[in-house]
């Protein structure tokens, strides 16, 4: 929907409708809510993974340290060392996996922030561009209106000066001059077309030879 407002010499200038601006703001709000929901889902996924790892670690702690129960029959000191080393290795791998997940999550968050900043900058630039275009359009309309008013005033003064008959004869003379200029331009166009056809014919003849 477009409203119209009177400005200066204008009678009807279209301006943005408040309903259109409200719809645009609602759409932006819905997009922001959708992005926040996606972020929360990612956070919940990472937290669920961390809680699972934490519960697994607590379960191992409740079962007691490796030396808390008698080693299997026939197990040597070297076997116990190997099992302890494997356990440390698995723990280190889990910690690395946790760090990797956290780093990936933080990276996604930073990328999302960068995308939001970029969209906000693009939106601000687009708004500024549209505002500038609207201002230029209004100024152009104002200049056109001022020029028309000036021409109308000049014609009115000329008509008052020459009278209706004199002004009519002047207009007829201007029309005859414009018609003569139009005939001259048409003749120049015909001459140019004839010259083009002449050279085109010569080129075609050369190619055929």
Swiss-Prot record:
GO cellular component terms, semicolon-separated: host cell nucleus
Post-translational modification: Ubiquitinated by host E3 ligase UBR5 leading to HBZ degradation.
Region (Disordered) location: 41-165
Residue span of motif Nuclear localization signal 1: 87-92
Motif mapping: Nuclear localization signal 2: 116-120
Main location group: host cell
Top-level taxon: Viruses
GO biological process, one term: symbiont-mediated suppression of host innate immune response
Subunit structure: Interacts with host ATF4; this interaction inhibits viral RNA transcriptional activation by preventing ATF4 binding to Tax-responsive elements. Interacts with host CREB1; this interaction inhibits host CREB1 transcriptional activity. Interacts with host JUN, JUNB and JUND. Interacts with host EP300 and CREBBP; these interactions inhibit the association of the coactivators with the viral promoter. Interacts with host UBR5; this interaction regulates HBZ protein stability. Interacts with XRCC5 and XRCC6. Interacts with IRF7 and IKBKE; this interaction modulates host interferon signaling.
Entry GO MF terms: DNA binding
Motif Nuclear localization signal 3 in this chain: 137-141
UniProt protein name: HTLV-1 basic zipper factor
């Amino acid at each position: 929907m477009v409203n119209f407002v009177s400005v200066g010499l204008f009678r009807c200038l279209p301006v943005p409708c408040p309903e259109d601006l409200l719809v645009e703001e609602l759409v932006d709000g819905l997009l922001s809510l959708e992005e926040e929901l996606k972020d929360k889902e990612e956070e919940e996924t990472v937290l669920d993974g961390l809680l699972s790892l934490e519960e697994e670690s607590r379960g191992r702690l409740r079962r007691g340290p490796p030396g808390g129960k008698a080693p299997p029959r026939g197990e040597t000191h070297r076997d116990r060392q190997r099992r302890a080393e494997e356990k440390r290795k698995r723990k280190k791998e889990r910690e690395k996996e946790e760090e990797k997940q956290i780093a990936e999550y933080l990276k996604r968050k930073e990328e999302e922030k960068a995308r939001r900043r970029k969209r906000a900058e693009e939106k601000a630039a687009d708004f500024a561009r549209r505002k500038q275009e609207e201002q230029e359009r209004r100024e152009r309309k104002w200049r056109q209106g001022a020029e028309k008013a000036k021409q109308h005033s000049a014609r009115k003064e000329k008509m008052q000066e020459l009278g209706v008959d004199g002004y009519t004869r002047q207009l007829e003379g201007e029309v005859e001059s414009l018609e003569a200029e139009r005939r001259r331009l048409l003749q120049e166009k015909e001459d140019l077309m004839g010259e083009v056809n002449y050279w085109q014919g010569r080129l075609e003849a050369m190619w055929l030879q």
